[in-house]
């Protein structure tokens, strides 16, 4: 049994946002579903009656991507505002199943490619 009494009495500092890169989208969906359910249950037992902005959301995932150019270079794009939020970035650097085109050839993403995408989102 997990003791969450301290969590029930605390007030969150900022809303949570999860930026899941393509390599980790399935795990991020599971984390998001668990977090949504947990926060809604915890919010329903809120004794103070305070409603915190962004505490209980339908999803904490944000839309982000790292599109690649023909040269193999990429850029990080976040399609919504994350100002004032605690952002967590999820990436699986060992996922070799993803590919991208560079100079007309299909390349598998290496751990370094995933790490570069992580830095682009940050």
Residue ranges of model-derived segments:
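PRPP-associated nucleotide enzymes
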Residues: 1-122
